[in-house]
Amino acid sequence: MGLAAVALPILIHLFTRARAKPIPFSSLRFLKQLRNQKIRRIKIRQILLLLLRTLAVLFLVLGFARPTCRTQSGSGARSRTSAVLLLDNSASMALEEQGESLFAAAREAGARIIELMQPGDELYLCTTTDTLEGTERRAFHDFQAFRRRLEATPLSFRATDISAGMRFAQNLLQSAHNVNKELYLLSDMQATGFAADSLPAREFNPRQYAVPLLASHPANLAVTGVRLRSAILERGKTVEVEVTLANSGQEPGRTKLVQLFIHGQRVAQRMVSLERGTTAQELFRFIVDRDGWIEGYVQLEDDALMEDNLRYFTFYVPERLNVGVIGERTAGSELLQLALQSSADSSAFLRLFTVVPERSFGLAIDSLQLLLLHDVSRLPDAVVERIGAWHSRGGGIILVLGRRTDIGWYNARLAPVLGLSPVLAAFGEGGHFSLGRVDGTHPVFSGIFEGAEIQFARPQFNFACRVASAPDQHALLSFSTGDPYLYEVRRDEGALLVFTSSFEPEVSDMAYRTIFAPLLHRSISYLAAHGQNRGVELSAGEVLRYRLAGQELQKQLEIHRPDGGVDLVHPGITASGAWIDHAATGIPGLYSLRADGKRLAVWAVNIPARELDLRRAERELVEDSHHLHWVDDPARIDQFIREERIGREYWRELLLAGLLLLLLEMALYREKGELPSEEESQEMRRGS
């Protein structure tokens, strides 16, 4: 009925005009032409005024009618809704923008979504860091309880996986029974949180919305890595630690202070400056004044994201090494033991357990840090299997091949278990050859040679084993023939050093050279450091694993957490031994395993490196690959949802347009000098 008012201006115009018979006046024809031109302009203006008045009334009527443009998803707007709030609670959400963290902004956006829920609706809460907790699977019908649950959800230091979180949320919605199904992703849209492949569309077609919580220009430097550069660790010696820094913010680099702490004491510091989007490695040196487990951390000055300014590390400086030696009682074996016990320091540092191959059954291999096999002919199969299992857990091995070595047995049994290349043949019988190339850059030679030049008396050989080359072989010493004399095979599970000629006097004079004892000691220290410091750095959420020795099974085992808490743990018995598995590693810091108070192992748990990359995902890619609708203004998320559910109302725009047209009509009507006189009005009425 309101639209009928649109006709009022037209009816007034039609019924108020007067009709008069024109009387031509010949003497004023020229003046009439001028007058007609003016009247024509006035009539055009009146038509415009009529059009403006008509449109103004039309827009005002439509505005009061509150027209709504319904979306495709709004068909079931009055039906009950099942919604999932997928909350990004990763460490990057702690980034502060104008004094408020992105995580707090995400909670506020979630609270506005809760206010739109009606009786009969249900809500689920999931996080992008852990979607496996049973408490996250139940639906909330009490929205106040859901709000409390949302406010109580803490930040997590685990890696975020938005794609996995969306799949989990979709599974929850698929099992829900309400007609409307909605998914809200509250996140900083970190690029590393999205999988490279697309998320498959679901048949039930839930409405999925991305609510981006973004910082405009954050200034942030991060410690993304700490790596132990020193391969040989000894008390009283210099240790090198490499620290990786990254400018993950949006502002150019500013000078920041980086400090390195050992057992709470600052031992090194440096000023650094990085440009936006760049990384750098800084090398810190300090002297370690104790043995055992060394605990440390690297700290940056405060910035927009505090959580990535601290990174922990740990390493082990051997106190005393248990070294097992398997070999026949020969002159070479005696020279080997003399070299290992050549000083008071080494005799206190090394504890040797020597057995012949026939009695190798009795060697407690699990209690060793290093095993040396010298010119062994054969070993029992059971001993070979024990050695292989021990090596796979990080045990270091020095293997010396010689004339007594049964090449057939070695190629068939020992080499496959240890992952070594087979021996092709023996060479050098009846002749003499010496050493050739030396890789002086390897850590084993650190401290042996003075200066850049490598000079030492080269030993002579008349027998050696030629081994097949392999990609994982690295030659430290080579014969003049080019064949390796000492080579390394290093893998994640353990390292080996292989000598292809024995220390027997009838084979070589290596045992009489000055390089012999230092080379053995450095080799043992190198392998021991590799074995003890393997797997000591983990990411938050990963499992701590430790294999217990037999004598530790009856002791009280505890995991000491960074927050001061203590967890009692119990070993699990498997075919490979007794293991401690501890998964409660959600807090960054240093975790230690203790048996009756004695520390057995220490782990450094840090925020995953990929979580420190603050680059945002590209909007177009995310919308296409994950079927998300982008919410441009998270502060008005409630209005956005209402429009998506019910449709968009345009009454504000229509009323505003009507008022603007009325103002334009008033300005045009009162334009100076354009109001017609009474005579002109009568003339226009007669002309019309």
Give the residues covered by each predicted segment:
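Short, charged loop segments at secondary-structure junctions
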Residues: M93-E96, E133-A164, L213-P218, V317-N322, ...
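Juxtamembrane linker/hinge segments adjacent to transmembrane helices in membrane proteins
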Residues: M1-L62, H629-E644, R670-S688
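Von Willebrand factor
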Residues: G76-R137, R147-R149, A164-L172, N180-S187, ...
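Beta-strand-rich binding/interaction modules
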Residues: R235-S273, A280-F284, G292-E301, Y546-G572, ...
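Acidic, S/T/G-rich, low-cysteine, solvent-exposed domains in lumenal/extracellular/periplasmic regions
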Residues: A191-A210, L321-G324, A331-H530, L553, ...
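Enriched for extracellular/lumenal, surface-exposed ectodomains of secreted and cell-surface proteins
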Residues: L186-S187, E295-E307, F503
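Membrane-embedded catalytic interface detector for glycan/lipid assembly enzymes
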Residues: V356, R490-E493, T500-V507, R513-L662, ...
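Short beta-strand segments of immunoglobulin-like
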Residues: V226-L233, N533-E537
